[in-house]
């Protein structure tokens, strides 16, 4: 399967924007296996709006509360089964977006990193560019490597910070794939106006 798993060092670091950017420029399919906080709108709706070239697949699990998947499911008196999270079949690149960071619980025994390990797609880690990002990013990279999740690289989101980029590349032994500076507004036009990725979608067609 040709694709990437877009994860982040935290929630609200820009995973959906980066997913839309990749999906638009690669003309890819987009799938978010678990969507929480659906009462506030869904990320697949956002990507459909931001990346008109993308083909959107519905989430396998949609939960109303804006909480971690395990807690959002508990409040609905249900349980998320990892085996039910099966990627869509497609002949296009697939951009998969996680919920929260890699250690967020999916149920009482499984974490997001377990799903990443199961899917075995190369990870794109979205990180903030500012203070605190070195620690969060290096810990995320360390856990991904411990679990042998393939790692494509890091996308930094925010004002450029050369010192933080250098530290992440040096200590993390990873490539910073892109630096996306703050946009005046996040729209289909501004996403399309971003420079295209300088890296190709990995995997077999």
From Swiss-Prot:
Mg(2+) binds at residues 16, 97. ATP binds at residues 97-100. The active site is at 32. The keyword ATP-binding applies. GO terms for molecular function: ATP binding; dethiobiotin synthase activity; magnesium ion binding. InterPro entries: DTB_synth_BioD (IPR004472), P-loop_NTPase (IPR027417). Its EC number is 6.3.3.3. Gene3D superfamilies: P-loop containing nucleotide triphosphate hydrolases. It is found in: Cytoplasm. It is an enzyme of class 6 (ligase). Keywords: ATP-binding, Biotin biosynthesis, Cytoplasm, Ligase, Magnesium, Metal-binding, Nucleotide-binding. Catalyzes a mechanistically unusual reaction, the ATP-dependent insertion of CO2 between the N7 and N8 nitrogen atoms of 7,8-diaminopelargonic acid (DAPA, also called 7,8-diammoniononanoate) to form a ureido ring. Homodimer. Belongs to the dethiobiotin synthetase family. This is ATP-dependent dethiobiotin synthetase BioD. The gene is bioD.
